[in-house]
């Protein structure tokens, strides 16, 4: 699990802890926390017909797009890119949440920019709005809410809780001019960020870095949940306010804290990524259609939406519009046992005004002597010019000529 996944989840934990804490520690904290949440609120316009609303007060399943933005520290002041992109679906009725991590280099359509590019460029081109619209189209689900966090947030939060203590078993190292001593040490925000980011000097490489990242976020959350953390709540709120943007309201967060906690008992985590490809000397991740479809289906089910139609189901629905009753057809957008078996070839018959028509797998055959005006003609099909033509065969003068 990479740094930003840990940071994003850590910040979500902090938000929920703050909301829970205000209920126990008085009106002043309640007022300050309410003000902070109002300060980080930023609505976006969604350009999608996938449905952008979910009633959290009524405990409806909902989705959140989580983004870790690579700006705000190390001299980076531009809008930045979403270095980490995750989609979390939360379903309190099933007591379950699903978290899908999206590789930053996924090649996809950037909605609103009329181009194909890396997924993380959507935020760079159009902020949270373009990122949301792009992910909605990619995953074929509505994105009900979002939370974005910039790089400086980790540093500020470590400072806000008064630092964290770790045991640096790697030995002293320097990253971007910041030296981290060996042994049991107390880290401030600057050294804590370096400790979480360093990879090349760790004998375990990225595995070791992931372990340190997990350690840092766990230490932060533990400090926030402690009495010491509560006493520093104002600094914690300031760190959140300076580094987080979301379209979740204060009431939404109160409802999540009180009505959705059961949904966090089970969290299924998956990674959506494809195969590596270099296109015009640029590295991309190209998604496998089957893996993408599986992820789409998982998320739609978690949100209580109808199952996404497979290509097989789309083909069957195409034939159904011409009055061919196919028993294994699953209409587009519907789910059920029929869709589960749609990959197998089945045979069924239907009466039409023109005669008996049989559909078997992907072929159609009319009963002998019967003419069906709805018969599909493939304009690209090969016709043998030397084949025998029956002079008594009926030819429909209105049939399209190819």
Regions inferred by a protein language model and the residue ranges of each:
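Entry/capping segment at the start of metal-dependent catalytic domains
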Residues: 3-95, 288-292, 296
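C-terminal solvent-exposed extensions
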Residues: 51-52, 247-372, 376-378, 384, ...
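Extracytoplasmic
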Residues: 59-62, 79-85, 94-102, 114, ...
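Second-shell loop/turn segments in exported
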Residues: 73-76, 116-125, 140-145, 200-207, ...
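Soluble non-cytosolic domains of exported or imported proteins
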Residues: 81-82, 113, 122-129, 148-152, ...
